[in-house]
A protein has these predicted regions:
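Interhelical loop/hinge segments that connect adjacent transmembrane helices in multipass membrane
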Residues: 1-4, 116, 172-182, 192-235, ...
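Signature of the first transmembrane helix
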Residues: 3-62, 100, 127, 163, ...
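Interfacial transmembrane-helix starts/ends
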Residues: 5, 43, 75-89, 218, ...
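Membrane-interface junctions at transmembrane-helix termini in multi-pass inner-membrane proteins
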Residues: 5, 130-153
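Short membrane-interface helical motifs at transmembrane helix boundaries
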Residues: 28-31, 94-113
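Membrane-interface helix-loop junctions in multi-pass transport and translocation proteins
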Residues: 31-39, 144-149, 160-192
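Alpha-helical transmembrane segments of multi-pass membrane proteins
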Residues: 51, 97, 112-134, 184, ...
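Helix-loop junctions and terminal segments of transmembrane helices
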Residues: 57-72, 143, 257, 262-299
Length: 300
């Protein structure tokens, strides 16, 4: 069994198991243990973090997959990956400055329909940053064709931690407010685990490395931000917009419907985790026959 078939099957199983946990959370635990208001708030925060993620990552997760095959020596590969750890700071730092200086204005604007959002607005850039760097570290392992553990963290572990937290609300170990704050801890822990996995596979180097393709990398990442932001908005902008026009409880109802519809995309989502880096490598090496074969195999 080839690496595509093997990891696609593993990722598909992981994704379906993760969706099973997600179904229990979305259809039962959120609605019964957390309540409509805080379920809607949670969906708003996670959707907003998902919208910010491409900006916070500055397209680095896709840039890593595209450009990694171009570096031939182990030193160059390690240097490139280390460089990409700091590359997103080009956009992160200006964004954080804007959040700092215009915090009150932005928070008041976003919470005009649902005042509850104001007290939790500080979580948005943090969640976006954590989600962004999770994807950077996930891309780090994908280019080494080891996508399964990252899929486990993303699809199963996060949902299990949320499930445990929701049950803690039910037995009064946590309040609903504490649960919402705990989202930062859950996504922070997931990002740290992904970082450990990435560094276990290939350690960063303590040396400044500026790739000669810097200009091309910068331009590509800028375009990826546009496409990535559009893709993220198509997935998450609806829940964000609902919170701006109607009561936040409606975000909870809508999230249940969206989750049910998302099950259809599971096989494609799982296969993409391994086919994306393989496609990038074949294109970088001009292996068009192998690329043609890969397209045929994955379209079946």
């Amino acid at each position: 069994m080839g690496i595509v078939s093997k990891q696609s099957i593993q990722n598909t199983l992981i994704t379906y198991v993760g969706f099973s946990f997600g179904a229990v959370n979305a259809l039962f635990l959120y609605t019964h243990f957390l309540g409509e208001t805080y379920y809607g708030l949670t969906a708003f925060l996670l959707s907003s973090g998902g919208i910010l993620m491409p900006l916070m990552a500055f397209g680095a997760h896709n840039t890593i997959i595209k450009y990694f095959p171009l570096f031939k020596t182990e030193q160059e590969k390690s240097g490139f990956l280390t460089f990409m750890l700091f590359f997103p700071l080009i956009l992160i730092l200006p964004l954080l400055v804007l959040f700092f200086f215009f915090y009150t204005d932005i928070a008041l604007y976003l919470s005009r329909e649902n005042p509850i959002i104001y007290d939790f607005f500080w979580m948005l850039p943090i969640l976006g940053l954590l989600m962004g760097y999770f994807e950077v570290f996930y891309a780090w392992v994908k280019v080494h064709f080891q996508s399964v553990f990252g899929g486990f963290i993303k699809e199963i572990l996060i949902r299990v931690m949320i499930m445990i937290s929701l049950y803690s609300v039910h037995i009064h170990w946590l309040t609903s407010v504490q649960f919402v704050f705990l989202l930062v801890v859950i996504y922070g822990l997931s990002t740290v685990l992904m970082m450990i996995s990435a560094f276990w596979i290939r350690k960063p180097i303590a040396k400044i490395f500026i790739p000669k393709e810097f200009k091309a990398i910068f331009v590509y990442s800028a375009f990826i931000i546009l496409s990535g932001s559009v893709a993220a908005m198509l997935i998450d902008i609806d829940r964000f917009m609902i919170s701006q026009f109607v009561k936040i409880e409606n975000v909870a109802y809508y999230s249940v419907a969206v989750f049910i519809a998302a099950v259809v995309a599971v096989p494609s989502r799982a296969m993409h985790q391994i086919t994306h880096p393989i496609t990038a490598r074949l294109m970088a090496n001009n292996q068009h026959d192998e690329l043609n074969m890969l397209y045929k195999q994955t379209s079946i």
